[in-house]
Design a protein with these regions (language model features):
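Conserved phosphate-binding loops in N-terminal lobes of ATP-dependent enzymes
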Residues: 1, 95-206, 346-362, 383-390
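Metal-dependent phosphodiester-processing active-site neighborhood
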Residues: 73, 285-324
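Gly/Thr-rich phosphate-binding beta-strand-loop-beta motif of the actin/hexokinase/Hsp70
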Residues: 43-73, 255-291
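Amphipathic alpha-helical scaffolding segments
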Residues: 63-85, 180, 184-186, 202-204, ...
Length: 398
């Protein structure tokens, strides 16, 4: 991979005149055979607009939002920014071929928010002191869920899940890779809209379930990722990067995004993939907040991992889901990969539609009833915990 200061005008094509097997043939021993011209890069008029960017780094999914000047926040899409030197055609197979070719780089399609929090390692790692995006790790954007599940057994280029909670030093490095690429692609979208780097500010959320040391490490890694993603050491990261707990962030979403009036008494509960984040308010005053590690993974993913046949029942006659189920069966002896595969599947639109339409049909059967009861028990436990906190606040006359 090479980073250029401007869009290239052409690519020189050369071939090895003598067969060297699988070994690399140096440039001077190759024969130049022609040029491939690139289309002109689009010219963008710079503006003085400001973008406030919010990045929600989630256990299962991550989201990117932006607020331009004083407008309401919007979800940010990563558009297809590949500058192809040829017309990929309109045939479905040709388009699919191009999309598969770019899986290991930047997708040649629109990537909406949220997208799954997954990294992939490369076979041939290009090491760099600053862990630059795309070199040895890149964000694995899930396109076809079946292809993604089929990629799980590949130990040479493993898919990395649970980045948010990996306490190892290598895990923090992977967070930096993920964040740096997210910042880079966000900056590209801003530039395409005429917004300059110096007019960007970044906001990140984190769970209060993090320890103090983990929080410090997360902030340090994330700030470094901003500088790397922007390729700008002069960017005033300390001034232009803010952090807020997920409990407060979700409360602000309800108060401002959903325009819920925070008068009298309000309890917010945000149940995510890895944590449930809670806050209690009275007359717009924050009384209490917390997060704990009881959430979606602990219920749905764990249950399906131990009761795989329920996926088949929910899938009905959907060929894609049934084939995905068979692939999951082939890796069921590896509990970690199986759980990751189920996470991929349940986050697919196909499974979401099947679950919505068919779960009510399977709740009369043993496994379906168990999952429903477990879900109700978990939610009841969260609400019981909240009620205990509320009672304590009342007794303490807070």
């Amino acid at each position: 991979l090479r980073s250029l200061k401007s869009s290239p005008e052409a690519i020189m094509c050369n071939v090895a005149t003598q067969s060297g097997g699988k070994s690399y043939t140096e440039h001077e021993k190759r024969l130049d055979v022609g040029l491939i011209l690139f289309p002109d890069a689009n010219q963008v008029q710079e503006t003085s607009n400001q973008w406030a960017v919010g990045i929600d780094f989630g256990t299962t999914n991550s989201c990117v939002y932006f607020k331009e000047n004083k407008e309401n926040p919007k979800e940010l899409e990563f558009k297809n920014r590949i500058n192809l030197p040829y017309d990929p055609g309109t045939d479905e197979e040709e388009i699919e071929e191009v999309m598969q070719a770019h899986k290991e780089f930047v997708p040649s399609r629109i990537v909406p928010s949220p997208f799954m929090t997954i990294l992939r390692e490369r076979n041939y790692k290009e090491s760099s002191a600053e862990n630059l995006p795309f070199r040895s790790n890149f964000i694995y954007y899930v396109d076809q869920v079946l292809y993604a599940i089929q990629d799980l057994p590949d130990d040479k280029r493993p898919l990395k899940f649970n980045l948010k909670w990996d306490e190892a030093e290598q895990g923090r490095t992977k967070v930096q890779y993920f964040m740096a690429q997210t910042v880079l692609q966000t900056a590209v979208e801003a530039a395409a809209n005429g917004v300059k780097r110096e007019n960007l500010t970044f906001n990140f959320s984190y769970p209060e379930a993090y320890t103090a040391n983990f929080t410090t490490s997360f902030k340090k890694v994330t700030r470094r990722a901003v500088n790397i993603g922007l390729a700008d050491e002069n960017y005033k990261t300390l001034e232009k990067t803010r952090f807020e707990t997920e409990s407060i962030s979700s409360a602000l979403y309800f108060a401002k995004g959903q325009e819920v009036p925070f008068v009298n008494n309000v309890v917010t509960i945000d149940i995510g993939g890895g944590t449930s984040d809670l806050s209690i308010w009275q007359d717009t005053k924050l009384l209490w907040r917390n997060s704990f590690r009881l959430a979606g993974k602990d219920v749905l993913i764990n249950y399906l991992t131990n009761n795989l046949t329920l996926i088949k029942e929910i899938s009905g006659n959907d060929d894609l889901l049934l084939e995905s189920y068979q692939t999951l069966q082939s890796i069921r002896t590896n509990k970690s990969k199986l759980a990751n595969g189920i996470e991929l599947l349940v986050n697919s639109p196909q499974f979401g539609e099947a679950f919505k339409n068919r779960f009510s049909m399977v709740t009369g059967k043993e496994k379906g009833k168990e999952l429903r009861d477990l879900t109700e028990l978990t939610l009841s436990g969260i609400l019981y915990y909240v009620s205990q906190v509320v009672n304590h606040l009342i007794e303490s006359r807070v």
